[in-house]
Amino acid sequence: MRKVFETVVGLNPNFSFRGKQQTRIETFSDAVFALAITLLVLSSTIPETFEDLWASMRDVIPFAICVALIIVIWYQHYIFFLKYGLQDKVTILLNTILLFVLLVYVYPLKFLARFLSEIYGGIFGIIETDLSRFGEYSHQNLKLLMVNYGLGAFAIFLVFSLMYWRAYKMKSLLDLNSYEIFDTKSSIIANLLMCSVPLLSLIITLIDPWGNFRTTILSGFLYFLYVPIMIVFGRITSKKSRRLLQD
């Protein structure tokens, strides 16, 4: 199967993939990713009446958001092992931590997705907002929600950066060329940037400068920083990689 993927449009043609054979680490990891999506499904109750059915449809968008985020994490995991094929103890440890965080992260992620979907659905008139089903949405509860989400996002991208750092430390053993070393360094920085945004949001939430809902609103809007940060970083690395390939 991996030999087929080597020719698929979308993979980096300038990187020699070393993980051409799927390992037991990846097989186990894929099972955990599948379990994470299964937990999302099991967290929803089976509708028994028409009212329950229409109510369950409110969870379609939150479910789609959660599945999309899990697939993004899975894809980055897949690309890492496809590039390097590492099976050493440190990589296994980091991979285990990643999977643990993912499973812990599933329920807070779905809760946040449902909560935001309810709010924005009401703002744009898509659904009639009913926040009562979330219990007391006090400032302290929203802070706890933002802290849980921030810790999960920060931990996941930090682990990815450490995994790429491990690959970089083993560059001689992996026989990485100059472009592959640059690509590995870029992946380290990209994941550090990805974990810096939830870290900033987490710090603002814990400091709580206003002591009211404005803090959690700001903490949430900070995640929009992903767009300009990753666009700028992508352009910088793209220019450097083109120069490197031309030399």
Curated annotation (Swiss-Prot):
UniProtKB keywords: Cell membrane, Ion channel, Ion transport, Membrane, Potassium, Potassium channel, Potassium transport, Transmembrane, Transmembrane helix, Transport
Annotated site (Hydrophobic filter residue 3): L42
One GO term (biological process): potassium ion transmembrane transport
Residue positions of motif RxxxFSD motif: 24-30
Transmembrane segments: 23-44, 56-78, 89-117, 142-165, 187-210, 215-237
MF-aspect GO terms: potassium ion leak channel activity; proton channel activity
Site entry: Hydrophobic filter residue 1: L35
InterPro entries: TMEM175-like (IPR010617)
Family, per entry: Belongs to the TMEM175 family.
Protein name listed in UniProt: Potassium channel Ftrac_2467
Provenance organism: Marivirga tractuosa (strain ATCC 23168 / DSM 4126 / NBRC 15989 / NCIMB 1408 / VKM B-1430 / H-43) (Microscilla tractuosa)
